[in-house]
Amino acid sequence: MNFETVIGLEVHVELKTNSKIFSSAPAHFGAEPNTNTTVVDLGMPGVLPVLNKRAVEYGMKAAMAINCEIAEHTKFDRKNYFYPDNPKAYQISQFDKPIGEHGWIEIEVGGKKKKIGITRLHLEEDAGKNTHTSHGYSLVDINRQGTPLIEIVSEPDIRSAEEAYAYLEKLKSIIQYTGVSDVKMEEGSMRCDANISIRPIGQEEFGVKTELKNLNSFNNVRKGIEYEEKRQAEVLKSGGIIEQETRRFEEATGKTSLMRIKEGSDDYRYFPEPDLVDLFIDDAWKERIRAEIPELPDKRQIRYINDLGLPAYDAMVLTLTKEMSDFFEATLAAGADAKQASNWLMGEVSAYLNAEQKELHDTGLTPENLAGMIKLIEAGTISSKIAKKVFRELAQNGGDAEQVVKDKGLVQISDEGALRTIIGEILDNNEQSIIDYKNGKDRAVGFLVGQVMKATKGQANPPMVNKILLEEMNKR
């Protein structure tokens, strides 16, 4: 029996506000444990939450960016549960009236585009963090408690691990463009749970789902889904049944393990938050927030293809992160050719960032010095090979491209007389290569070009070398 996988993703994104959603405590990452707290975060008796307007507006902006309808009337609710990192014994969230509903984003997998529906986007507060020690006790840090979150719940429209990966990449890109979050999974500002079920191909009814947690990277989301697909298929093929449960992805083994039997929403005993009034959002407020949304990646891709003549793949890669796209645009503004700038950013720059595990802002590269280097290549001042040395110097130490070329003595040798002298000496020492060339062995030319480049430390003008080399060999 063959099965179809049905996946829905729940993504939590921390909003980049200065203070928490219901208190005045700072909301930044990395502080000493239990220092970013107030009596509100600690759930002390008699204290009242105060709603952070900026968090609401960030939620509206994110919802609009993923094509959600913004509610005219929304409210907050108490989600009741006890856990050490939740001092109030309830979480303030949104239950039946979320701030955004009925959205969608478009993904592309294997050259095919597909719309993934968004059920809802709602606001809530984050919980604290437990650290379990090997000494039989746990440590609780309340710093994260009360940090504003949006939870984005997809429709069960995702059919594979690859589609889930593409959805997360696209969602991260869109949220990053809006500026409402850093969406850094390594810092916990973007987290994902996956709901996975399988059903026989052709069956309309959904299978029993399991919720998968501890997915701390996009790769782990993919691996967790792939494992869970196989596990559920094996259970059904052996005559077993799938239990509705929450499972943990174990990165060390690549497998999932049982955490607990899955709770339903009734288990949380939701009821309206009595300490916060309902929120009404009028059209004027919506339009003001909508006007603040910048050009999003899909529109930039279209502009890069239509206005700059870039291939669709280049446009997609360049717009995947706002930092890369903004850097590209600034490089063009500094005078670089669009295709050359695209090639460098997608090639050498991306390879360097991956190898060094850095972001663009962590390097010495600027749009101005990258554009300056590209213009030196176009002017024939340096070759593409020498440019790689210049690029590495700029990436590591910054500076001006032209000055680096001068200081390092990297100017391309384009003097015909000098090149003829060098080539003449090389031919004198490689008579067999001349004979091979005249006998039709083209690789002899490549060998001689390599000798010229070696003698000039890669600084000879390649087209001139080829031209002069052929002329000199044909004379002999």
From Swiss-Prot:
InterPro entries named among the record's database cross-references: Asn/Gln-tRNA_amidoTrfase_suB/E, Asn/Gln-tRNA_Trfase_suB/E_cat, Asn/Gln_amidotransferase, Asn/Gln_tRNA_amidoTrase-B-like, GatB, GatB_C_1, GatB_Yqey_C_2, Gln-tRNA_amidoTrfase_suB_CS
GO biological process, one term: translation
Pfam families xref list: GatB_N (PF02934), GatB_Yqey (PF02637)
GO molecular function: asparaginyl-tRNA synthase (glutamine-hydrolyzing) activity; ATP binding; glutaminyl-tRNA synthase (glutamine-hydrolyzing) activity
Catalytic activity of the protein: L-glutamyl-tRNA(Gln) + L-glutamine + ATP + H2O = L-glutaminyl-tRNA(Gln) + L-glutamate + ADP + phosphate + H(+); L-aspartyl-tRNA(Asn) + L-glutamine + ATP + H2O = L-asparaginyl-tRNA(Asn) + L-glutamate + ADP + phosphate + 2 H(+)
Presence of keyword Cytoplasm: no
Keyword rRNA-binding carried by entry: no
EC code(s) of this entry: 6.3.5.-
Keywords assigned by UniProt, alphabetized: ATP-binding, Ligase, Nucleotide-binding, Protein biosynthesis
Highest taxon in the source lineage: Bacteria
HAMAP family, sorted: GatB
Role according to the record: Allows the formation of correctly charged Asn-tRNA(Asn) or Gln-tRNA(Gln) through the transamidation of misacylated Asp-tRNA(Asn) or Glu-tRNA(Gln) in organisms which lack either or both of asparaginyl-tRNA or glutaminyl-tRNA synthetases. The reaction takes place in the presence of glutamine and ATP through an activated phospho-Asp-tRNA(Asn) or phospho-Glu-tRNA(Gln).
Family according to the record: Belongs to the GatB/GatE family. GatB subfamily.
Quaternary data: Heterotrimer of A, B and C subunits.
Full protein name: Aspartyl/glutamyl-tRNA(Asn/Gln) amidotransferase subunit B
Lineage: Bacteria, Bacillati, Bacillota, Bacilli, Bacillales
